[in-house]
């Protein structure tokens, strides 16, 4: 089923961040900007993609002190403020790799909460 393949690839991408930013077809904006959101300071990296890879615009927010990836945001059409932002909270160790334990999703347009993905290892 195409939807299952899409979701598998999408979540593989999310769990592979930020290393997936090195994938072919990823275009990283050369200038990193500083941004403060709710009192938290971030280094923000903008990524777009070659047409064969994807059409969305993504922003990746790294903690200014630790450089840990703390949130990301994507737009299908940035001028419409569509898409979502995702907050990463807590960490879990999976086979020696630190992974975000909780991923909370919100709409860009109105900050409405969508859902939280929770990673658990048993």
Predicted regions and their residues:
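Gly/Pro-enriched, hydrophobic low-complexity segments
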Residues: 41-122
